[in-house]
């Protein structure tokens, strides 16, 4: 009987030692938490990439409106880019771009012009986040979060433009197998 108890104790000790080693290994392998600027940059770039994919993917009918009272597809993208520059001009203390709430269509006549303006606003935002680092991002954290959310809200609006046009938004399409 003592032999059985001893065997059980040895086995239990080995199991516990292996569990402790596995737990320690898992803790060592866990990635470091993101810094504030890394988290803001990741979110900014994620929604920016989604918007740019939509902007590139949308047919050339950039004047399409859900209803007569709403902005056109182009105007939504211009509004996003202009708002991005409103933020960037304030946090950087310099005029980085056209920060009007609704830049006029006449200033951005083609799909390529609109996409380039949107892309530049997103790229400039990412560069500003990196330049500011954690201290700068934390100083303007409410702004960065608010404007990133603003991009996300308009992304959702553009999904409605896709659906109303019987199109499937890029992020809702089946993933291509590799």
Language-model-detected regions and their locations in the chain:
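A short small-residue
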Residues: 27-32, 98-106
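Acidic/histidine-rich alpha-helical segments that form the ligand environment
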Residues: 105-153
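A non-catalytic, amphipathic alpha-helix used as a structural packing/dimerization or gating element
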Residues: 42-46, 50-53, 117-120, 124
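Bacterial N-terminal signal peptides that target proteins for export
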Residues: 1-20
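Short N-terminal segments immediately surrounding and downstream of signal-peptide cleavage
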Residues: 28-49
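Boundary at the C-terminal end of the N-terminal hydrophobic targeting segment
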Residues: 21-26
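Short, contiguous alpha-helical
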Residues: 41-45, 52, 61-102, 137-178
């Amino acid at each position: 009987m003592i032999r059985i108890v001893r065997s059980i104790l040895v086995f239990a000790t080995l199991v516990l030692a292996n569990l402790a080693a596995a737990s320690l290994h898992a803790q060592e392998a866990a990635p470091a938490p993101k810094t504030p600027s890394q988290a803001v940059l990741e979110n900014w770039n994620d929604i920016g990439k989604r918007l740019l994919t939509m902007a590139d993917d949308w047919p050339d009918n950039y004047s399409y409106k859900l209803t007569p009272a709403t902005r056109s597809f182009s105007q939504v993208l211009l509004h996003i880019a202009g708002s991005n520059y409103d933020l960037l001009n304030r946090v950087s203390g310099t005029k980085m771009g056209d920060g009007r709430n609704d830049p006029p269509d006449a200033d951005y006549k083609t799909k390529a012009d609109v996409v380039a303006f949107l892309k530049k606003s997103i790229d400039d935002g990412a560069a500003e986040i990196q330049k500011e680092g954690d201290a700068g991002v934390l100083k303007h954290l409410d702004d960065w979060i608010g404007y990133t959310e603003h991009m996300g809200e308009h992304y959702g609006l553009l999904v409605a433009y896709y659906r109303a046009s019987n199109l499937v938004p890029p992020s809702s399409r089946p993933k291509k197998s590799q």
